[in-house]
Amino acid sequence: MELFSANYEENTRALDDLLGVGRCFDMISRDLYVGGRRARMWVVDGYGDDAVIERMLSFWLPLRDVSDAQTMQQFIDRYITFNEVNAEQNVKNTVTSVFLGKMALLVEGYDECALIDAKQYPARGVEEPSSGKVLRGAHDGFIETLVANAALLRRRIRDPQLTLEGHKVSDCSRADVVLCYLENKVDRKLLDEVRQKLAKIDVRSVSMSQESIAEAMMGKKQWWTPFPKVRYTERPDAATACVMEGDIIVLVDNSPAAMILPTHFFDFVQEANDFYFPPLIGTYLRILRIVVFLLTMFITPVWFLLVKDPSRTQAGLEFLAIDSHYSVPLLVQLLLAEFIVDLLKLASLNTPDVFSNSFSMLGALVLGDFAVQAHWLVPEVLAYMAFVAIANFAQPSYELGYAFKLLRLMLLLFVGALDWIGLVLGCIVIVALLATTKPIVGKGYLYPLCPLDKKALLALLVRKPISRDNT
């Protein structure tokens, strides 16, 4: 059955079967009389706003006659005192709408169903996200409810040019996806490309929300590149700034993270804190972040290259030499330290909040002290790895941190096998990866460096004062 008919019993049987009435404990179905006609309503328990449903029932039940409404649309116009309601004849669309939280109402004599958007999703309060915190500025953040996230953007951009364009993705989950952009600033070609990629997503479910959608949009062509092709933010102010610059924000229901498109490598240099400090300090923070990027990737491979040959640490670089005796090969020590850092991160993530901070500190101290006393690691290795672990948190992207980690491991292996030639070869591989990585949409991944856009590159490196042309 694809469309509702004028047969009331047939319509109700079809919806009861498709919605799982009697099988699913949370599917509420109630028979009632509206104006002397049989009617039935369906709603998912936990989705419906009880106050709204009760108010509508109190209006319908006293009705004596509704024969003046010849169609369901006329019935809606005259007897449903609610803003968000529409008539639907397609059975599949009705079932999907009920699972999304709407209430369905069938009335005898009509070949359409009324869908009333009286949903109220369970949601946590709006609070500052755990990542991307700022010293000053707004302390609110996106949550798992799409409507609330859209409202946070509307609150900041009170412009009729702001468009929130809705889409549905996947066959099973039918996830709600919203594209947020400014009509007068967005690149129309870029917008059409994003729409096409969303329309081509052919997956059964997007249970992991924005990550599932990002992977489906990227496809399988570039699985081998470690660099992130999407930026995420849980901060409404950061998302607002991107929209004002002409970017597209992708909001996904059930996810507090907003996707920023297009994403290029140098976009990760920016962070919300840059704009809550004066321009000079903001510029310093960006330059510091770039230096940290380079140190995070190269400090341990370069140090390993220098200490491999004692003669390289004699010309004023004696402080880099290892004084203590060690029996475990230095390359093995560095790799072991890398894995221990990741082990502590994973253990910290899976530890209850009450114990996580103390566990991380005690775990690092105990393991570090034990490794030195057992001659597994030399103190210098621990010192450099501690710097790398801390520096990873100086950049805003968790995904980029792991990309740097994989490349750092590659450099260590290349240096261990080929000495300085390995370092040069590793740098060539990194440049080749950056040059061949393609973003989901937009220009090259290294934009604005390649293709060169001096104005855009300067705007990324230097935090300019706020003006009418630079907001």
Question: Model-found features: residue ranges?
Answer:
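Short polybasic/polar patches that bind polyanions
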Residues: 158, 199, 345, 372, ...
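Membrane-embedded alpha-helical signal segments
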Residues: 1-302, 306, 310-313, 434-471
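Hydrophobic alpha-helical transmembrane segments of membrane transport and translocation systems
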Residues: 379-381, 385-471
